[in-house]
A protein has these predicted regions:
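Juxtamembrane loop-helix boundary motifs flanking transmembrane segments in multi-pass membrane proteins
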Residues: 49, 58, 62, 66, ...
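Hydrophobic alpha-helical transmembrane segments of multi-pass membrane transport proteins
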Residues: 60-140
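Short amphipathic alpha-helical interaction/hinge segments
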Residues: 33, 37, 86, 102, ...
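Alpha-helical membrane and juxtamembrane elements of multi-pass inner-membrane transport
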Residues: 16, 55, 72, 116, ...
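Membrane-spanning alpha-helical segments of multipass transporters and channels
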Residues: 127, 135-139, 147-228
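Transport-system extracytoplasmic interface segments
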Residues: 1-89
């Protein structure tokens, strides 16, 4: 007996659930048929049960105890949210100052050295995200029951370069535009491609090499790989 099934894999969550359910149902039906055949041949029930599956599989998940998408997808989404919001805020700040300078307005950003302005913006904007990082990686992880194997010190040691790189990328993004609405459009449009290029939803082996190379320049991509 051949059991065939097909589905639209573009809906990967629905497709995965349906495919797993059909595979389990087919395996159970095949086991029942084989056990019934062995019983009809005079085999005892314990021997017949062992006959169709002599080797048992004991799966022990290490990094994803629930074997679900919460432990796998949610942490990556948290990292992407932090990245996009920080990038958006820093980019809007820089673009707003460029827009005001274009109208002939004077501001503090024109009266201080570039390195001093960059240092101040890094400390202020990056420092503001200490609280969101604590909320996402602390309270939210505990609330959703997400497995966490890293020590707090190691987590912060990895978070620091992520915040620095994202802040500086936002500074570069803000310097490229003279209208404050443009960084918002760029960040929003880039969100979905960054999700698929990060490698936790779509396999990296199936992503074109040029796109994968470009994605490595965005802080969220190596950060998601490192956190997961």
């Amino acid at each position: 007996v051949t059991l065939g099934y097909a589905g639209d894999a573009s809906y990967f969550l629905v497709y995965g659930t349906i495919a797993e359910g059909l595979a389990q149902a087919g395996g159970t039906l095949a086991a029942q048929v084989k056990v019934a055949r062995l019983l009809s041949q005079g085999e005892a029930l314990p021997q017949a049960a062992m006959g169709w599956n002599a080797v048992g599989l004991n799966v022990v998940p290490v990094f994803n105890p629930s074997m679900g998408y919460v432990n796998y997808v949610v942490p990556a989404v948290f990292v992407l949210i932090l990245h996009q919001v920080l990038l958006l805020g820093t980019g809007i700040l820089g673009a707003t100052q460029n827009q005001r300078s274009g109208r002939g307005e004077q501001g503090y950003w024109q009266q201080v050295p570039v390195l001093a302005l960059l240092l101040a913006r890094t400390l202020v904007v990056g420092g503001l995200f200490v609280l969101p990082v604590t909320y996402f990686f602390g309270f939210c992880f505990d609330y959703y029951g997400i497995a966490r194997t890293a020590e707090p010190a190691a987590l912060w040691l990895f978070t620091l370069p992520f915040l620095l790189a994202t802040t500086w990328l936002g500074v570069v993004l803000g310097a490229l535009f003279t209208r404050r609405d443009l960084p918002t459009q760029v960040v929003l449009i880039s969100s979905l491609p960054l999700v698929f290029l990060a490698g936790f939803i779509w396999p990296l082996e199936l992503i074109p090499t040029p796109l994968n190379w470009l994605a490595q320049w965005v802080p969220s991509t190596p950060a998601i790989e490192g956190f997961l």
